[in-house]
Amino acid sequence: MSSPEKKRKKNQKSSPNPSLPEDLIVSILARVSRSYYTNLSVVSKTFRSILTSPELYKTRTLLGKPETFLYVCLRFPDEANPRWLILYRKPNQTLTKKKKKKEDSSVHLLAPIPILNSPTVEWSSLVAVGSYLYAITADIKDSPCSNVWYLDCRTHTWLDSPRLRLAHINSDFNGRTYFPGSSEKPDSLNCVEVYNTNTQTWNPVPPQKRKLKFGNMEGKIYIPPCQENHRKAVALNPKVLTWEAVGLGTNLDRGSFCMIGNIAYCYDPSGKFRWMNCNTAEGDWSRLEGLEGLPKFARYSTVKLAEYGGKLVVLWDKYVAASGYKEKMIWCAEISLEKRNSEEIWGKVEWFDAVLTVPKSYKFVCAKSATV
């Protein structure tokens, strides 16, 4: 072996493996889809630390790389805490034509995620504000909660907000979350409180601003009806802080309803998908047209709707005959929406997949999208 070759090999053995600067690693990881973060976190402690750091998500925002993910919460028998899952497209998978896809394995799946400090209490409403999901406990018939838990979707950790006096239902508008109270007197400061998600502070709505009236819903927050206590749907105008009764009916399951922009979508007990423009005073439901290729749901199916990057996501379950009807399969469909005129909205089924097998006794708690 020649002398130069010996020298080169000696230098290779003696030189330590150089590591990349941390800011460069952050810049690289910020360009990678978050769906790969779980696998990347086992590469090293450094990667694991960076993947949960605020700097990474700030960089993703600056690079225009935020992604929307659908979070699904399920309850299982004999488990105190709920399970959380994220809808993923399997790596290196592309959507295929429906006829061919039936012969292939699923392209999408609901993948479990570890959640730290998950509260054991159940909530009746969940609202997304950026990368946070705020959970409010119980319905109006139950005792009021005094604090609000929120899930940080970047670190998958539950945190506790500052305490408030009363909160039940909520909705997000311009970085603030509104919490109407229960049957308090109209002059009570506990009637409505506003939580500023940026400053994490509570402020009561002044009594003179709490008024009930009828009118159109332009630019207002919709609060779904509740079957159990016959509460009708209402809307809040955040600009002037006034309430309005809304004629949306009371026969809708909260999970079978969602808002996309100013349009309300629902799946009614008759098996129809409907929509309503909340900017009109009439408040009439219209049938969602199209939906070619979407399977018919069984009458027993649990059906949930959620907004997902401007599209409509539908989740439903179906018994698995091969299991002796001891299991159910959760299915998911993504539907793009096209408003053709003031009277018609058409839905196009982009894909549908079997995403998770569950025991028949499971409970579907909620589905909500967050941007991280």
Curated annotation (Swiss-Prot):
InterPro entries: F-box-like_dom_sf, F-box/kelch-repeat_ARATH, F-box_dom, Kelch-typ_b-propeller. Residues 14-60 form the F-box domain. It comes from Arabidopsis thaliana (Mouse-ear cress). One of its GO terms (biological process) is ubiquitin-dependent protein catabolic process. Kelch repeats lie at residues 176-222. This is F-box/kelch-repeat protein At5g48990. Keywords: Kelch repeat. It comes from the Eukaryota.
